[in-house]
Amino acid sequence: VSRIVVALLFVALNFYIYRYLATDEVIPERTSFESFPMEIEDWKCRDPQQMTPEILENLGATDYLMCNFRGDDPKEVVNVYIGYHETQVRKEGGGSKENSIHPPEHCLPGSGWDVIEADVIPIDFEGLPGGTGEAKRFVIAKGNARQLVYFWYQSRGRAIARNHDVILYRFLDRAMRRRTDGSLVRLTVPIWQEDEAGAEAELDRFASEFVPKLDGYIPN
């Protein structure tokens, strides 16, 4: 019973704050991913990918970057997806458009990938808000193929991974800062011949060179 009461109080407080304390949402200025560099050190994106209008509408992203960055070795490839959402509030007046960020763990099974390892790990790549954060680390499988995935939510000066933190900070920032903008950053590398350590080293090397470039594209 106490959990039900707490849940009802949370819903009531949520409604009050959203309705009366945060009516005019702040949309921060940022640089479009159209100008994002396609060469970072020895990594090159030669095949930027485009979403169909239907997929983009379903994701609710305002802007995105999706590309395979390749190194000098043909086996060196990092798939990058960043979806930026300038707001995660459904517009008043209805409509079916969903603006909130979709957690990757909800989408992977639908694309045929099974999550066989899942952890939350600390990250300290240069360029992260505050210099540190957390990421979810997945190993995913489809048949004999294996991939290593890092993803985190880089939003309003934080890099966080846990879904309950995402919900909590979105609620607080909407109330206190009138902002709900945020981004999902996802990096994926193939695991060749079960060499998980090699995939990890490749992803870390890429991220250390890639993450500092996000300044200006993801508002803090």
Give the predicted meaning of each segment:
Residues 32, 56-58, 127, 174:
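Residues embedded in well-ordered secondary-structure elements
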Residues 65-206, 213, 217-218:
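A cross-kingdom signal targeting lumenal/periplasmic-facing segments of multi-pass membrane
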Residues 22-40:
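Alpha-helical transmembrane signal-anchor/signal-peptide segments
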Residues 21-25, 44-49, 57-60, 116-117, ...:
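A short linear-motif detector with a strong N-terminal bias
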Residues 2-18:
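Hydrophobic membrane-insertion alpha-helices, especially the h-region
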